[in-house]
């Protein structure tokens, strides 16, 4: 029945008493409770899984019989068998005699029906005059015997004895019917012969006839149940079975039917519209399938209220047209108390929005009481009168409120905390984002705009770099396509390719992945005036009055037309020596206006990929300050560089030379803005007697980083220091500075007798040495394809010798050997006679160093 506990007991007792009372049987409440407790003891599955149907009830009977055989008949309550038989008769809509005859396997259903029909026909025709005939008395006797057999001991006798006894009773019934039919036939033949032998012309009767006539007349009015003789037809036909009045519904459905007749509509859900058109709003009430509610509760308990399967079950429930009261009962029964409060709050908000949207749009006004089931629509009987349009709004708001319930553990700031992980693919992140957004609002233009905005803001830094060029013009498909292969290796390769083509990283990404209507390569020409794409210089609409006027006569040397800050003269026009140029204040002003302090720092980015040999070195006095109150002097890169995580620490040249002011020492620190972009500057100390070029130690903190020529990367702080009489190792520092960094070592000599191995790089076979002990793979210059891009590095190789002018591949290469493969960034050395396979490949292909002693063998 689906209900257990005290509530299930009360429901079963009330239904049992009502069903038996309709048959004229009264069962005490104590007897009904005793039977229910015995039923739970015999069939514990019935309260939860069973129902009042013939199949389950027969199963209960079999288990009662088994229980009696094991524990004895005394263990069964006195009223158990009568109650069980009465309910079985109700469920099958048959009499006790038919039930008993149907259980006899040797008697077919057709024979049983024919025998019963003849029995009833013979008994009805036996009534002639006076009292009831002897046939009725004999039939009643047999029926009483059969009834006693049914109610007294239906299961105590053995199966074989039961069948034999049932056969005997059926044979007796047939004999009674046949005997009465033969007697009736003989009597009619005798009356017909006497009628034909009568002389109708002679009115005189014999004395015996007159005596017989007077005797019959004396008893003419003795019996009130006078039945006139009916002439039987020659062709005997089987009488039609009487149509019985259908029994009322049983079980929980019957209880609800009785409640509807009395006006109690508490359980009248869902409201089903049976009309063929939308205009037919005649409601019919059906119980919501119990299995559906169980499935919904199980899904909420095991997977959560916001799981996709749970939402699918909610949509199935929503197809049943529930009223506001029904939705509240369903949510309260399946959700946790906290989630129910969230659902109710969201449902009320959605209902208020619906009332505001539908105001003045419909003929029938929709009120908040209709949607919430409050006020005059508080009772379920008033809610069933709601129109179909109102019930649609109720269902829509209820489903949206359910979808707004957050997953377990995420109660607030769902969208703000939905970030893409560093190793998470972009398409997986978009899937989680769409699920969260659609749980809060329906699909539409508003949800698409929100998803696109969050797809950019909540993406990781790598995907943001890929999306940034197409953020405003691209679609979600462009975003996903741009981040399809997002990985640090891909970004590094794209940065190398952009540097080789002399383009900005953002421009290269936009041209590679598209990002708008024109697709790849649709940016158009670049304006040389404003730097924007889509037009040329002569069509530029930017203001042209902001150009800087040409310089006049230099006020410092008075020998040429150039700016004072760019004056390099050491003598004026009269030959007098000039003092050092005071550039701090001047450069500060120029920096505010956007003017670079030196020719090198104002050079065009990307045009010069190396050092400018014609530019003289700068001194400490030439370095600018960001603002008048800046504590540090800005150090700028004088070379375009691309840094990756595998490059480690690199040295960036600044072309700044000369000794520091007396009594000071220098401290190099980074800039916070560069660190946010992924560039990490290692602090360094510049001695007061250092006369060489100041270089900055940098490395990539997160992903590949591009440093443009003239870009400010670090600051130089001039600090006073205290001299102590400590021992001095060297008299002067001179120009000696940093040593070699990012070394790649090999420790064995190279000869032709070494073992060689063929490995494919991007589909091209290379032959190289195995036992060199190199940490990184080094490709010989003669083996490197000319069309594969490379770039120079600041690293050098050390081993038995020294290799300078080392280059590196500008793109990641995929190597493959048999079933093994991977990604490497090899070095390219022009002077190397052989290609050297490093540990970055050998450890992946499981190369082992073997000796005669197994203990000394190890994997690379």
From Swiss-Prot:
A lipid is attached at residue 2 (N-myristoyl glycine). The active site is at residue 771. Residues 154-169, 178-193 have a biased composition (Basic and acidic residues). It catalyses: dUTP + H2O = dUMP + diphosphate + H(+). GO terms for molecular function: aspartic-type endopeptidase activity; DNA binding; dUTP diphosphatase activity; structural constituent of virion; zinc ion binding. The record marks 99-100, 195-196, 228-229, 254-255, 269-270, 496-497, 745-746 as: Cleavage. GO terms for cellular component: viral nucleocapsid. Residues 766-841 form the Peptidase A2 domain. GO terms for biological process: proteolysis; viral translational frameshifting. Pfam families: dUTPase (PF00692), Gag_p10 (PF02337), Gag_p24 (PF00607), Gag_p24_C (PF19317), RVP (PF00077), zf-CCHC (PF00098), zf-CCHC_5 (PF14787). PANTHER family: ENDOGENOUS RETROVIRUS GROUP K MEMBER 24 GAG POLYPROTEIN-RELATED, IGE-BINDING PROTEIN. This is Gag-Pro polyprotein. It comes from Mouse mammary tumor virus (strain C3H).
